[in-house]
Swiss-Prot record:
Gene that encodes the chain: aspS
SUPFAM superfamilies per record: Class II aaRS and biotin synthetases (SSF55681), GAD domain-like (SSF55261), Nucleic acid-binding proteins (SSF50249)
One Gene Ontology molecular-function label: ATP binding
This protein's record includes keyword Ligase: yes
Organism placement in taxonomy: Bacteria, Pseudomonadati, Pseudomonadota, Gammaproteobacteria, Lysobacterales
Subcellular location: Cytoplasm
Name assigned to this protein: Aspartate--tRNA ligase
Organism: Stenotrophomonas maltophilia (strain R551-3)
Length: 583
């Protein structure tokens, strides 16, 4: 139906007859001549229809937005060059136009940017927009480049099951009733984690998969119910082997896909250092602001909000200096306090130093003149600055002060241009869940501890460090991995520390424990979020922009109207009866 793509018509074709197909982006009838901007996936070319070709002119004059056309014509040089178009030096003089399909009146035009609900309801129209085409192509190029790199490095692309076993220790599973086994269910995989480990036991050495994963969890801009990850696993490796390989891969992929030169070597930072300096296990290093511990300077003050945590081994009192922050009004300071409260803060103390050196602070009265001056000096505050203080449990203070750091960085224009990758390593093995009164795995239950001795792990579970690692880019965790447990006795011990008894472990993970018993090699791996990396490359904050058919934050597909009710006959086939909703 076509000989050339619209966006690729150029001066080399002048004088030649071409056949094009695409959508009417714009049609303009200027009396003696009609101009049609014809669009396909490669771009736009101007089609010109002259009035002396009466039949073709009549068709052109009747066109509307998004009508689908086939155009035959001769390429000629444009009298008025349009430097804003790739095809701006040429036009196609139409000799025939066939309307392949008329478009109904549109809910929005391809060059408009309507609300997100409208975009998702008419996703097929939204995806025609040039910006959406660009972002989807970025994703496509990313996946193609990853596959090519891994194929060249000897990795094997192996599929793992979509219908699998429900397991604990993660987000909520999506469950699928098993028709042939009444009362029993499959689960959609949250990741291929256990299958890729078993592939290492099976001797495949290097595995990868562009895997679809499913987690029934609350949605936000960077999270979806179903998502795509690059899943990788290596046999006979240590942490640095995995990190060096994927660092080189990510550096090459960014250069190939978006022509970005990442650092020749990514910095490494322990989890403890990241939390201490930045209040986050995924710090955005483009923001130069850092947290400063001040417990030693405030522990003998008369301010009980500070003295309690400052004298508690599990407490923290941290300060954040914001250059130029003295310009904040009382209302704006309250907004910062409200932001911190979302992350667990019960209050936010501050010291504000005006440009003329005048100090205002609700906590100054709790300090001697000397100790207050020492506190100001310790945090490096000067004229024009504000310093926020957080006090409480170590992790909670780190969380809300880290959130303030990000907000301040954006509000005060302190986010540097460019890309800031790093590795965060040495994560805690466990964290204590106050609600359930037990340890939970910080990464997942299959992450190896840094110690090989089970007795040591049991005795020091609270402070145990794992062999986990995350790759962070501009404050986004783009990849997470670890060296895995390959000994069945260690895996059983970790299950036990997580409150998973031997009977439960056998019922839910017996296949893994059995596999580890038959000569499992040391192995490790990593998984990268394709959606998140594509969003960063495309320059959008929402992964929904780089997913062709995403769900809303309300977990709905507005285009297909999913989820939707199921008729009783279908429910009966899978032995399910739905209870009526109750208030």
């Amino acid at each position: 139906m076509r000989t050339h793509f619209c966006g690729l018509v150029d001066e080399t074709l002048i004088g030649q007859t071409v056949t094009l197909a695409g959508w009417t982006d714009v049609a303009r009838n200027q009396g003696g001549v009609c101009f049609i901007d014809l669009r396909d996936h490669e771009g736009i070319v101007q089609v010109t229809v002259e009035v002396d070709n009466a039949e073709v002119f009549a068709v052109a004059a009747s066109l509307g937005y998004e009508d689908v056309l086939q155009v035959e014509g001769v390429v000629r040089a444009r009298h008025a060059v349009n430097d804003k178009m790739r095809t701006g030096k040429v036009e196609v003089i139409a000799t025939a136009i066939t309307v392949l399909n008329k478009a109904a009146p549109l809910p929005f035009h391809a060059h408009e940017n309507p609300g997100e609900e409208t975009r998702l309801k008419y996703r097929y129209l939204d995806l025609r927009r040039p910006e959406m085409q660009r972002m989807q192509r970025t994703r496509i190029k990313l996946v193609q480049a990853l596959r090519r790199h891994l194929d060249e490095k000897g990795f094997q692309d192996i599929e793992t099951p979509i219908l699998t076993k429900a397991t604990p220790e993660g987000a909520r599973d999506f469950l699928v009733p098993a028709r042939m086994h009444p009362g029993e269910f499959y689960a959609l995989p949250q990741s291929p984690q256990l299958f890729k480990q078993i592939l290492m036991v099976a001797g495949f050495d290097r595995y990868y998969q562009i895997a679809r994963c499913f987690r029934d969890e609350a949605l936000r801009a960077d999270r979806q119910l179903e998502f795509t990850q690059l899943d990788m696993e290596f046999a006979f490796v240590r942490e640095r082997d995995v990190q060096d390989f994927v660092e080189d891969m990510i550096r090459g992929i960014f250069k190939e896909v978006v022509n970005v030169e990442l650092d020749a070597s990514f910095p490494r930072m322990t989890w403890a250092e990241a939390m201490r300096r930045y209040g986050s296990d995924k710090p955005d290093l483009r923001i130069a602001l850092e947290l400063v511990d001040v417990a030693e300077l405030v522990k003998n003050s008369e301010f009980p909000v500070f003295t309690g945590p400052a004298n508690d081994a599990d407490g923290r009192v941290a300060a954040l200096r914001i250059p130029g922050g003295a310009s904040l009004s009382r209302k704006q300071i309250d907004e910062y306090a409200a932001h911190a409260a979302k992350y667990g803060a019960k209050g936010l103390a501050y010291i504000k130093i005006a440009d003329n050196g005048e100090v205002s602070s609700p906590i100054q009265k709790f300090f001697s003149e000397e100790s207050f001056a020492a506190l100001v000096a310790h945090v490096g505050a000067g004229n024009g600055d504000i310093v926020f203080f957080g006090a409480g449990g170590y992790n909670k203070v780190s969380d809300f002060m880290g959130a303030l750091r990000l907000k301040a960085g954006k509000d005060f224009g302190l986010v540097a241009d460019g890309w800031a990758p790093l590795w965060v390593t040495d994560f805690p093995m466990f964290e204590w869940d106050e609600e359930e009164q037990r340890y939970v795995a910080l990464h997942h239950p299959f992450t190896a501890p840094a110690v090989d001795d089970i007795a040591d792990l049991r005795a020091n579970a609270r402070t145990a460090v794992s062999r986990g690692y995350d790759m962070v880019l501009n404050g986004n965790e783009i990849g997470g991995g670890s060296i895995r447990i390959h000994r069945p006795d260690m895996q059983s011990a970790v299950f036990e520390l997580l409150g998973i008894g031997a009977e439960e472990a056998r019922a839910k993970f017996g296949f893994l424990l059995d596999a580890l018993n038959y000569g499992a090699p040391p192995h490790g791996g990593i998984a990268f979020g394709i959606d998140r990396i594509a969003a960063l490359m495309a320059g959008t904050e929402s992964i929904r922009d780089v997913i062709p058919f995403p769900k809303t934050t309300g977990a709905q597909d507005l285009m297909t109207d999913a989820p939707s009710p199921i008729v009783d006959a279908q429910l009966a086939e899978v032995h399910i009866q739905v209870r009526p909703k109750t208030n």
